[in-house]
């Protein structure tokens, strides 16, 4: 019975194709390729790769982009950037990369010093997986398909958890935290969070709608705000919305370096080690089967070493990934309420109970080491008595 149905269906489909062919339609034998040069609308210009390789005279891009193109080539992304698609790119030119190599958090002095993980972070963090004009960055589409303008301040990048796997050695593990003790001898492979990293942007419309003034911007980014400007993290867009066959190219005045989530920044900062020690009390490694599988599938395809187990560096909290509490330890033991932070400082995509992923961010006011030491070691401050009562060693 089923074979007869299949045969009848096959004859019906052949009949439909024949009818369409007679009528002048050729859908069943369509060889139309959007990537063929003759099929591309002239107003779309070049592909993103071609535009960066040889900027059009009509475009506002300036300088050369050999280093950025090298990232594309090394990561096997040339075909994607050369074909039709939907990407938004925020690229820095070679002069900006020269400045980056003079001073960066990885101490990379040249392109050759970049590891594959660093290359992935620099490249994938500078890309959005859809085509968005800069004036549309702060717009958010609601469930009823209407658009609310001027509220978004971040977008999900092309980066994945497997792009940022770190092997953490004993000297870098949280101190006085038994959850990490099994990994002191050989270290541990971790991702800081397995949700997609976000790109933070500041547009004039979003700043006006949310009461962010120039002084606020300077405090957040460390540079003055230029009226009408659009910034990606702290990098100003100096050439915008260059239309290409597969999306838009924007040029930034500096290399976009992912700052990491709040927990990472506190951990990596040179003058917040005491606050980081306090924060470390609330973290633990959680085995991540999906990230381990994803990484090893890719490693197998590309002939690279596989990793036995990859963990997430997570924080006990009332609000964590997926807006769900993380209130059990890695062994699924329930945690006391006083072991839960208000929210997870390592959650890349944090949003509050009344916000959205695109329009909301967390904030932490973190004292530097000097302030912490003064609070606990100065007899005139309240922390001095606390330390006297609970410190294991005398003051």
Language-model features and meaning:
Residues 23-27:
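C-terminal motif of bacterial Sec signal peptides marking the signal peptidase cleavage site
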Residues 2-16:
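Bacterial N-terminal signal peptides that target proteins for export
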């Amino acid at each position: 019975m089923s074979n007869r149905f299949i045969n009848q269906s096959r004859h019906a489909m052949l009949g439909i194709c024949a009818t369409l062919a007679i009528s002048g339609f050729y859908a069943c034998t369509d060889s139309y390729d959007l990537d063929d040069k003759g099929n591309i609308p002239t107003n779309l210009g070049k592909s993103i790769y071609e535009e960066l390789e040889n900027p059009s005279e009509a475009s506002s891009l300036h300088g050369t982009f050999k280093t950025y193109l090298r990232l594309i080539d090394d990561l096997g992304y040339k075909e994607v950037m050369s074909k039709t698609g939907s990407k938004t790119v925020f690229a820095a030119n070679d002069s900006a990369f020269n400045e980056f190599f003079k001073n960066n958090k990885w101490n990379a002095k040249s392109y050759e010093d970049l590891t594959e993980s660093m290359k992935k972070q620099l490249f994938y963090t500078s890309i959005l997986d859809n085509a968005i004009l800069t004036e549309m960055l702060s717009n958010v589409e609601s469930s009823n398909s209407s658009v609310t303008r001027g509220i978004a301040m971040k977008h999900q990048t092309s980066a994945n958890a497997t792009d940022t796997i770190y092997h953490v050695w004993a000297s870098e593990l949280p101190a006085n935290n038994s959850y990490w003790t099994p990994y002191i001898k050989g270290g541990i492979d971790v991702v800081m969070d397995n949700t997609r990293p976000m790109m933070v942007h500041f547009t004039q419309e979003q700043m006006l709608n949310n009461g962010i003034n120039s002084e606020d911007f300077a405090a957040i980014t460390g540079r003055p705000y230029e009226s009408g400007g659009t910034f990606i993290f702290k990098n100003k867009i100096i050439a915008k919305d260059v239309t290409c066959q597969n999306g838009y190219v924007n040029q930034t005045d500096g290399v976009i370096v992912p700052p990491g989530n709040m927990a990472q920044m506190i951990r990596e900062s040179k003058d917040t080690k005491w606050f980081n020690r306090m924060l470390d009390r609330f973290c633990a490694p959680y085995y991540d089967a999906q990230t381990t599988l994803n990484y090893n599938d890719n490693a197998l395809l590309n002939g690279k070493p596989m990793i036995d187990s990859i963990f997430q560096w997570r924080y006990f909290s009332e609000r964590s990934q997926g807006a769900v509490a993380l209130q059990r330890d890695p062994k699924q033991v329930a945690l006391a309420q006083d072991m839960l932070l208000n929210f997870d400082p390592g959650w890349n995509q944090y949003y509050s109970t009344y916000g959205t992923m695109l329009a909301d961010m967390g904030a932490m006011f973190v004292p530097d080491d000097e302030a912490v030491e003064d609070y606990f070691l100065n007899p005139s401050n309240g922390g001095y008595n606390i330390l006297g009562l609970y410190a294991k060693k005398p003051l």
